[in-house]
């Protein structure tokens, strides 16, 4: 086992009672602490509760917001707590300018890229089933948001992911 997650709160569809989601999320954070494992968080339409629970339970030293969907305010709140941000194909969507602002302010050692395959295919593959190989489009989107070359994003995100997950140890 290399991490706890993905876990967290999803209020978008309200398929699960929120009080139970909060209770289970707190227990998952406790487990990450007990096992000294990274925590991979999924949060959707639940930022305030997510941060409240993290503050109450204590954020594990290695915590990443997988498929980060927030804007600059949520990014700052996560980064100030020591969390990492991981960007998916959403970064390429025309409807995501605030997400691109968040990517621009993430420190070089605090962001990663991902696909969230089979979901959220990046532009120009939007509407299709996503594939891991399309992470290059995500990298291009992050590079554009940060105003850097895609090779810089590849190097920074690989270094961050390697450190975060203990790859190559």
Language model features with spans:
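Charged helix-capping and loop-helix junction motifs
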Residues: 18-29, 47, 96-104, 128-132
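Glycine-enriched alpha-helix->loop->beta-strand junction motifs that scaffold or abut catalytic
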Residues: 27, 34, 55-62, 77-88, ...
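Active-site metal-binding loops of divalent metal-dependent hydrolases
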Residues: 7, 43, 67, 83, ...
């Amino acid at each position: 086992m290399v991490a706890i997650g993905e876990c967290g709160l999803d209020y978008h569809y309200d398929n699960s009672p929120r009080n139970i989601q909060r209770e289970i999320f707190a227990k998952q954070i406790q487990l990450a602490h007990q096992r000294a494992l990274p925590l991979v968080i999924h949060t959707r339409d639940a930022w305030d509760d997510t941060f409240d629970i993290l503050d109450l339970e204590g954020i594990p030293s290695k915590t990443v917001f997988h498929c980060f969907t927030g804007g600059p305010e949520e990014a700052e709140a996560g980064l100030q707590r020591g969390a990492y941000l991981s960007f998916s194909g959403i970064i390429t969507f025309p409807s995501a300018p605030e997400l691109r602002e968040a990517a621009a302010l993430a420190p070089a050692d605090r962001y990663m890229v991902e696909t969230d395959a089979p979901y959220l295919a990046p532009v120009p593959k939007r509407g299709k089933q996503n594939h891991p190989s399309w992470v290059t489009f995500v990298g291009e989107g992050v590079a554009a948001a940060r105003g850097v070359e895609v090779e810089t994003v590849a190097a920074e995100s690989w270094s961050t992911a390697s450190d975060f997950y203990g790859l190559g140890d």
